[in-house]
Design a protein with these regions (language model features):
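Canonical Rossmann dinucleotide-binding motif of NAD(H)/NADP(H)-dependent dehydrogenases/reductases
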Residues: 3-34
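Substrate-binding pocket helix/loop in short-chain dehydrogenase/reductase
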Residues: 94-95, 102-104, 202
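Active-site loop immediately N-terminal to the catalytic Tyr-X3-Lys motif
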Residues: 96, 143-149, 171, 209, ...
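Active-site helix of classical SDR
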Residues: 118, 154, 162
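Alpha-helical segment proximal to the catalytic Tyr-Lys
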Residues: 123, 167-171, 230
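Residue(s) in the substrate-gating loop at a strand-loop-helix junction
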Residues: 138
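C-terminal helical subdomain
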Residues: 178, 197-232, 239-241, 266-269
Length: 269
């Protein structure tokens, strides 16, 4: 039997990229899915997935809209079993060029939107003593990079609130976990649509040696949404091809062929 048969899920940021892949995999596994997104493309995506998918226009920073969507999904389907907080925005700016408004905007969507989503569905899931919330953080929420002051901060916040929510909701039968993707070929990280082969040529510095397709991350969300992960609470599931596992010293055994900046070459005696 499919792993999500009979479950009702809400997936935010589902118009394209990882969110669309998550929604599609959920339906393939038997779920009924409400796709939400601020982009109008969400309608087309839901239609392409099929009759088990419904689209909602949704700004995740709008608390009233959250209540409307959750109430409508419950009215139509009787419950919400799974919430995936996937909506997010990416901004490449360093500390000196990031304005307070820049920081607030990224934090509002990525962190506050996730908080509002959890807060909205939690009473319903607590009442049923059942539910799974999966928050999309990032490998940058564990090991950040330069020029991501706002983005990494927001993803660290998602990571932290996931832990707190897991502690508070776990005794009520509600599981809360986070996924930490990295190097996924989505429109957010590859807005110019560069060919996969071109992207892969720059990936010799971590174990996978390539970017991932969105479905590879989506499969991790299926696991955490399903009963297969029944004992996972506050789990951080990293899906990054080994991006933050460590680093290679090129020129020493165990490293793949490739060229990196001097900081990643073997230390000299």
């Amino acid at each position: 039997m499919a792993r999500l048969t009979g479950k009702v899920a809400i997936v935010t940021g589902a118009a394209r990229g990882m969110g669309a892949a998550i929604a599609r995999r959920f339906v393939e596994e038997g779920a009924t899915v409400a796709l939400t997104d601020i982009l109008p493309d969400v309608e087309t995506t839901a239609q392409a997935i099929g009759p088990s998918a419904t689209a909602y226009r949704h700004d995740v920073t709008n608390e009233a809209r959250w209540r409307e969507i959750v109430d409508e999904v419950i009215a139509r389907h009787g419950r919400v079993d799974v919430l995936v907080n996937n909506a997010g925005i990416l901004m490449f700016k360093d500390l000196s060029t990031t304005t307070a408004d820049d920081f607030r905007r990224v934090f509002e969507v990525n962190a506050v939107g996730t908080f509002i989503g959890m807060r909205t569905v939690a009473p319903h899931m607590i009442g049923r003593r059942s539910g799974s919330i999966v928050n999309n953080s990032s490998c940058d929420g564990i090991s950040p990079a330069n020029s991501l002051i706002a983005y990494a901060s927001s993803k660290f916040a998602v990571r932290g609130m996931t832990k707190v929510a897991a502690l508070e909701l776990g005794p009520h039968g509600v599981r809360v976990n986070s996924v930490h993707p990295g190097s996924i070929n989505t429109p957010m990280v590859n807005p110019q649509g560069a060919p996969t082969e071109a992207l892969n040529r720059g990936m010799s510095w971590f174990p996978a040696q390539r970017v991932a397709e969105p479905v590879e991350a989506a499969n991790c969300f299926v696991f955490l949404a399903s009963d297969d992960s029944s004992f996972c609470m506050g789990t951080e599931l990293i899906v990054d091809g080994g991006l933050i596992a460590g680093h290679y010293y090129y020129g020493l055994p165990g490293a793949p062929e490739g060229v990196l900046p001097p900081s990643r070459k073997a230390p000299q005696a």
